[in-house]
């Protein structure tokens, strides 16, 4: 697999990492002790990561959210859960690999996991359709949510998609109906639902897994009704320039900090220094702890109260005073 491209603002980090690796390799080849030389470089690297990642612009966070080096649903399954059993098919047409789902255990408790899944190379991206589900993916998700409800098992969803697949076949097979059906059914599911935005949350394709009692979001994830490129192209007829994309990202308020302030999401999960891609295992631990805590709180609520509070939560969105 080819190395993932480095983002422009990350280049100073990549250059310093390369310098450190070369020094380590030289020390190993010649049996040299370079501890004194390494220490200041590693400190400089840590300081540089903090400096860069504490000052990301909204557009830079969009770029981070889309990185192929970020943990995907499959990575969180590997690091945060145990005993995963994948389930397939919508029982109506076909399997959709853009949605990964199945039974798992979280700290010993059975849960139903459902998440968008992307690819890291061409072969995987074609298999996963670049993380953009067909209607069959959303119908598979709903089938498994209803199965979880039958056995009174909590549902955990992971959101990471540019949007639902807009192809002709998907539209002919009822893409909009599949998304709308999920919104309706999730609003009245009788078990706890926690949605976590782990990367890019794009439009209705994200919302189809996002009607939940708690909506969590990683620090460098984004969530919006349209891509920044699409917004810039519609409003300013320029979806390619850095300036217009930055303007759109700021106007859309796509970041976790913006969305928790707007009460669209409930909690921000902090990422390791340098982003989630810098340490998959540490990011998964943070996710596991946050999910466990929220699930414990939701478990105390009776189903009717759970559903009522969930519906009220979403009905409150968009209210304002003049």
From Swiss-Prot:
Entry keyword Ubl conjugation: no
Name of this chain's protein: Acetyl-coenzyme A carboxylase carboxyl transferase subunit alpha
Native organism: Gemmatimonas aurantiaca (strain DSM 14586 / JCM 11422 / NBRC 100505 / T-27)
Entry's family note: Belongs to the AccA family.
Enzyme class: transferase
Gene Ontology terms for molecular function: acetyl-CoA carboxylase activity; ATP binding; carboxyl- or carbamoyltransferase activity
All residue ranges annotated as the CoA carboxyltransferase C-terminal domain in the record: 40-297
InterPro entries for the chain: Acetyl_CoA_COase_a_su (IPR001095), ClpP/crotonase-like_dom_sf (IPR029045), COA_CT_C (IPR011763)
Keywords in alphabetical order: ATP-binding, Cytoplasm, Fatty acid biosynthesis, Fatty acid metabolism, Lipid biosynthesis, Lipid metabolism, Nucleotide-binding, Transferase
Major location category of this protein: cytoplasm
One cellular component term from this protein's GO annotations in UniProt: acetyl-CoA carboxylase complex
PROSITE patterns: COA_CT_CTER
Spans through the membrane: none
Pathway(s) where this gene product acts: Lipid metabolism; malonyl-CoA biosynthesis; malonyl-CoA from acetyl-CoA: step 1/1
Subcellular location: Cytoplasm
Reactions catalysed, as given in the entry: N(6)-carboxybiotinyl-L-lysyl-[protein] + acetyl-CoA = N(6)-biotinyl-L-lysyl-[protein] + malonyl-CoA
Pfam families xrefs: ACCA (PF03255)
Disulphide connectivity of cysteines: none
Complex and partners: Acetyl-CoA carboxylase is a heterohexamer composed of biotin carboxyl carrier protein (AccB), biotin carboxylase (AccC) and two subunits each of ACCase subunit alpha (AccA) and ACCase subunit beta (AccD).
E.C. numbers: 2.1.3.15
GO biological process: fatty acid biosynthetic process; malonyl-CoA biosynthetic process
